[in-house]
From Swiss-Prot:
GO biological process: rRNA 5'-end processing
InterPro entries documented for this protein: RNaseH-like_sf, YqgF, YqgF/RNaseH-like_dom, YqgF/RNaseH-like_dom_sf
Catalytic activity, EC: 3.1.-.-
UniProt name for this protein: Putative pre-16S rRNA nuclease
Class of the enzyme per the UniProt entry, highest EC level: hydrolase
Gene Ontology cellular-component terms listed: cytosol
Keyword Nuclease: yes
UniProt lineage: Bacteria, Bacillati, Actinomycetota, Actinomycetes, Bifidobacteriales
Family: Belongs to the YqgF nuclease family.
Localisation: Cytoplasm
Taxonomic source organism: Bifidobacterium longum subsp. infantis (strain ATCC 15697 / DSM 20088 / JCM 1222 / NCTC 11817 / S12)
Keywords per UniProt: Cytoplasm, Hydrolase, Nuclease, Ribosome biogenesis
Entry superkingdom: Bacteria
Cited Pfam families: RuvX (PF03652)
GO molecular-function term, one example from the UniProt record: nuclease activity
Length: 151
C-alpha cells in the first residue's frame, strides 16, 4: 500500500510518497505548473500508476479561521477533477484488478511554515528553499495523514 501527498502551489505542485508500511513520507518531486495546476493531473495520474498508489492526500489550504478561500476552493475542484479522471481511467482499463485510489483532502494550514522550518533545520540555505518547499509541504501533508491513521 502506498499513499501520495499533494501540495498545490502556485508555481509547483509538490509530491510525496509513503513507504509501503504507511509509516514515513518522503519527497517525490515537483511538477512545474506556472499557475495552472490543473495541468498537473496528467503527471499525477502517471505517478499513481507507476507507484501503484492506493490513496491520494491533497492539501486543503484553509484560512486561519477555518474558512475556505479561493485557494481551498481550487484545491477542492482539483481533487474532484482528479477523482473524475481516475474514474474514467478505471472505466477505460481492461484490468479487472484496477482499484481506484481514494482521494482525500486534509487541512494544510501552516504546512509551508513547517516545511521551511524543516528545511532550515536540515541546514538548507533559505535561498534554496523555493525549489523544494512544495514537495516538503507535501511530505508534511502526507505525514500528518499517516500519523492520524495510527492514532
Amino acid at each position: 500500500m502506498v499513499w501520495l501527498g499533494v501540495d498545490l502551489g502556485n508555481a509547483r505542485v509538490g509530491l510525496a510518497l509513503s513507504d509501503p508500511e504507511l509509516t514515513f513520507a518522503h519527497p517525490a518531486g515537483n511538477i512545474h505548473v506556472a499557475g495552472d495546476y490543473f495541468f498537473a493531473i496528467d503527471e499525477v495520474l502517471n505517478v499513481i500508476e507507476d507507484e501503484h498508489v492506493d490513496h491520494v492526500i491533497v492539501g486543503l489550504p484553509l484560512q486561519m479561521d477555518g474558512t475556505e478561500g479561493k485557494s481551498a476552493k481550487k484545491a477542492r475542484r482539483w481533487a474532484a477533477n482528479l477523482e473524475k479522471r481516475l474514474q474514467a481511467e478505471s472505466e477505460d482499463s481492461d484490468s479487472t484488478e484496477y482499484q481506484i485510489p481514494q482521494v482525500s483532502l486534509i487541512d494544510e494550514r501552516l504546512t509551508t511554515v513547517s516545511a521551511h522550518r524543516q528545511l532550515f533545520e536540515a541546514h538548507k540555505a533559505s535561498n534554496k528553499h523555493r525549489p523544494v518547499v512544495d514537495q516538503q509541504s507535501a511530505v508534511v501533508i502526507l505525514q500528518t495523514a499517516l500519523d492520524r491513521t495510527r492514532e
